[in-house]
Amino acid sequence: MHLKTFSNLLVFVATVAAHGYVDNVTVNGILYTGYQPNSDPYYATPPPRIIRPVQGNGPITDLTLIDLQCGGYTEGGIVGSQPANLTAGPVAAGSTVSLRWTLWPDSHSGPVITYMAKCPAAGCSTYVPGTAAVWFKIQATGRIGNTTVWGDTPLKTAGNSYSYTIPSCLSAGSYIVRHEILALHAAWTYPGVQFYPSCHQIQVTGSGTSTGPSSKVAIPGVYKATDPGIVYDMYAVQPYTIPGPAVFTC
């Protein structure tokens, strides 16, 4: 069997088998259960959640959809960035936040990228960024050299866990944190790359004064179909360029 054909078969099997979403988030020692797509929509009164609703464990494959922002499914009634009814924290700038994903398939290798966007003074519970350029990247891990180790490898080897650090210089306030995995197992053409975004809301404290970089990005809009990190053959031995802006540092 030809290698590419065999790869296609593996992709199909993996696609049928499983994907994933962020199941819970630990902020300042408190574990917050995330949005549960298989049960939360059926409650008369929605449970308190810090994670914005997602359509399930499936991917977003169209870079132009608002669903790319936070994993919604607009056609199915879940808008691209429907606010959560709870905000985690308070948590000090400079702290580390831990996320736990559901089961993640071995075949779905790719980078892990985290963005933040500051909410208005009224908080995040009614804030919908839309197509405004409000997002900045705070973390990104791609392919380690030309190895088979990727940003999402810890999800397969460390109990489906991942963490990020809130920039220590950020000003106090409420933020949306957008955490995503790009699965590249079918990304040798576009459409092909699979996006698994998840957004949660946190209240940050501290004496920092930064609001992130002066130039921010819109989501959707940050990625283009022609970007090197969007179209990529992960089965080839070659470097990988993480798409999007540079990581913000204090």
Curated annotation (Swiss-Prot):
Role, per record: Lytic polysaccharide monooxygenase (LPMO) that depolymerizes crystalline and amorphous polysaccharides via the oxidation of scissile alpha- or beta-(1-4)-glycosidic bonds, yielding C1 and C4 oxidation products. Catalysis by LPMOs requires the reduction of the active-site copper from Cu(II) to Cu(I) by a reducing agent and H(2)O(2) or O(2) as a cosubstrate.
E.C. code: 1.14.99.56
Cofactor info, note text: Binds 1 copper ion per subunit.
GO molecular function, one term: monooxygenase activity
Top-rank lineage group of the source organism: Eukaryota
Keywords linked to the UniProt accession: Carbohydrate metabolism, Cellulose degradation, Copper, Disulfide bond, Glycoprotein, Metal-binding, Monooxygenase, Oxidoreductase, Polysaccharide degradation, Secreted, Signal
Signal peptide positions (record): 1-18
Compartment annotation: Secreted
GO BP of this protein: cellulose catabolic process
GO cellular component: extracellular region
Reactions catalysed, as given in the entry: [(1->4)-beta-D-glucosyl]n+m + reduced acceptor + O2 = 4-dehydro-beta-D-glucosyl-[(1->4)-beta-D-glucosyl]n-1 + [(1->4)-beta-D-glucosyl]m + acceptor + H2O
Species of origin: Botryotinia fuckeliana (strain B05.10) (Noble rot fungus)
Glycosylation sites: 24, 85, 146
Annotated CDD domains: LPMO_AA9
Residues the record lists as binding O2: 185, 194
Binding site for Cu(2+): 19, 108, 196
Similarity field: Belongs to the polysaccharide monooxygenase AA9 family.
Disulfide bridge map: 70-199, 169-250
Biotechnology (record note): Lignocellulose is the most abundant polymeric composite on Earth and is a recalcitrant but promising renewable substrate for industrial biotechnology applications. Together with cellobiose dehydrogenases (CDHs) an enzymatic system capable of oxidative cellulose cleavage is formed, which increases the efficiency of cellulases and put LPMOs at focus of biofuel research.
Cofactor field: Cu(2+)
ATP-binding as UniProt keyword: no
Main location: secreted
Expression triggers: Expression is increased 8-fold in cellulose-inducible conditions (in Avicel- and wheat bran-containing complex medium).
Protein name: AA9 family lytic polysaccharide monooxygenase F
